[in-house]
Amino acid sequence: MNLAYDGSAFCGWQAQPNARTVQGCIEEAMRSLLREPSLSIVGCGRTDTAVNASYYVAHFDFDELDCADLRHRLNSILPKEISIFSIEAVKEDFHARFGARRREYRYYIHTAKDSFKRSYSHLYTYNLDIEAMNRAAGMLVGTHDFSCFEKLGADNKTSICTVFEAGWIEYEPEIPGEGKYYCFHISADRFLRNMVRAIVGTLLDLGRGKRPQESIPALLESHSRCAAGESVPGHALFLSKVDY
């Protein structure tokens, strides 16, 4: 199952009691349509409250069904914030989470007030040295312990991740406004909870001169969340690609 969702209306992907989640909404709809009260779906990863996905993969086990019809019926009853792109049969050993080899996130910022970007981009009004930010982002590439960017109290077995690429680009929005528009993209084999937002916050500090770019290697070695920058808001973050 390939889908997208606007995370602003949900408390993240993962189903949880007394909270509106993407997984919970989809499972409720599918259980009703397929008359399977115990049906569950497995997602390619967990996204936090307000975080979006422009491309997301999930799987579920079912013997036989009309995939096109199920997609149509799901889209007709799911909240407007969730769109199902496709449903197709896969091999029995396919696993949406453990089979994923590469995930990509994008984070958007704009430097001047923009009514059309406010819902999916972070307003950051400081002048930024993008070249310095890109040099620092390049220092994240490779296999490292990223615990300095991990949410405190997380229960991961390991904080080791391999980052394949990371960097900033300036882009022109469809409806131009004042200021500049930037997108940070990062791909890795896995991500820790809050990792991307903490990295972005740290690079923004660096871009406005609050920390030197040479501090990144020492920051990784510190394993201290307190040494990194503050996490940026979740509404401007998108899971954008998953490779298998």
Predicted regions, residues:
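Structured-RNA-binding interfaces characteristic of tRNA pseudouridine synthases
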Residues: 1-244
